[in-house]
């Protein structure tokens, strides 16, 4: 990753700390992966405190595929089958079947409806019957171990929200340009500055977790 592009956001460790502070303050974070992987930036939010306005921003500027990152425990709690038995996607992204809140939504497409679905899915006592399938929210099952196991946006989202003190549930969506092409690092940085989001890379998060786990041991 071009460190010159990122230097204004601090050092690698500082970028993670700024991201955690932003989540605690109810703001979003721009997460970049490796230029040789997907080479994209995802807007991420803690599912617990995401607002309708943030969901609308995500839909307006994102790919339209709004994803709810969850762990295996939550997937089992909601009885969500994986989308396919044999995952042949390039990076093994852990899509489950799509979901919609069983109550409180109309078509399920609006920002308010998608946020209602997210809240239904992450509620402490959520049951499978609280959700209809299919729907307009795409759950993603993160790998245990987070970014130290898989360097994906799904794992980065759960690592960041849990390190920030939230339950393991976050919303992500890939940033796109106005012409429909994928936003790359320079466009992601410009967007993040415009919308008061810190920028962090998955590589930063790996370094941060490794450093903290070394201290703990």
UniProtKB/Swiss-Prot annotation:
The keyword Metal-binding applies. The keyword Magnesium applies. The record marks 136, 174 as: Essential for catalytic activity. SUPFAM superfamilies: YrdC/RibB. Mg(2+) 2 binds at residues 38, 153. D-ribulose 5-phosphate binds at residues 37-38, 42, 150-154, 174. It comes from the Bacteria. It catalyses: D-ribulose 5-phosphate = (2S)-2-hydroxy-3-oxobutyl phosphate + formate + H(+). Keywords: Lyase, Magnesium, Manganese, Metal-binding, Riboflavin biosynthesis. GO terms for molecular function: 3,4-dihydroxy-2-butanone-4-phosphate synthase activity; magnesium ion binding; manganese ion binding. Pathway: Cofactor biosynthesis; riboflavin biosynthesis; 2-hydroxy-3-oxobutyl phosphate from D-ribulose 5-phosphate: step 1/1. Its cofactor is Mg(2+); Mn(2+). Its EC number is 4.1.99.12. GO terms for cellular component: cytosol. GO terms for biological process: riboflavin biosynthetic process. Binds 2 divalent metal cations per subunit. Magnesium or manganese. Catalyzes the conversion of D-ribulose 5-phosphate to formate and 3,4-dihydroxy-2-butanone 4-phosphate. Homodimer. Belongs to the DHBP synthase family. This is 3,4-dihydroxy-2-butanone 4-phosphate synthase. It comes from Enterobacter sp. (strain 638).
């Amino acid at each position: 990753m071009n460190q010159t592009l990122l230097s204004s956001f601090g050092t690698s460790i500082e970028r993670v700390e700024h991201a955690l502070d932003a989540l605690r303050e109810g703001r979003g974070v721009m997460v970049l992966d490796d230029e040789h992987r997907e080479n994209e930036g995802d807007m991420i939010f803690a599912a617990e405190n995401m607002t309708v306005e943030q969901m609308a921003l995500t839909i307006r500027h994102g790919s339209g595929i709004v994803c709810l990152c969850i762990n295996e425990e939550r997937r089992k709690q909601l009885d969500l089958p994986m989308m396919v038995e044999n995952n042949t996607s390039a990076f093994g992204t852990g899509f489950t079947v799509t979901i919609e809140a069983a109550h409180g939504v109309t078509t399920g497409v609006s920002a308010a409806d998608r946020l209602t679905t997210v809240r239904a899915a992450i509620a402490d006592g959520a049951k499978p019957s609280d959700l209809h399938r299919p729907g307009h929210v795409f759950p993603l099952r993160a790998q245990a171990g987070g970014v130290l196991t898989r360097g994906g946006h799904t794992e980065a989202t759960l690592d960041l929200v849990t390190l920030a003190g939230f339950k393991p549930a976050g919303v992500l969506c890939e940033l796109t340009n106005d012409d429909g092409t994928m936003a790359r690092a320079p466009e992601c940085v410009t967007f993040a500055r415009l919308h008061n989001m810190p920028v962090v890379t998955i590589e930063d998060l790996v370094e941060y977790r490794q450093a903290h786990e070394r201290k703990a041991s």
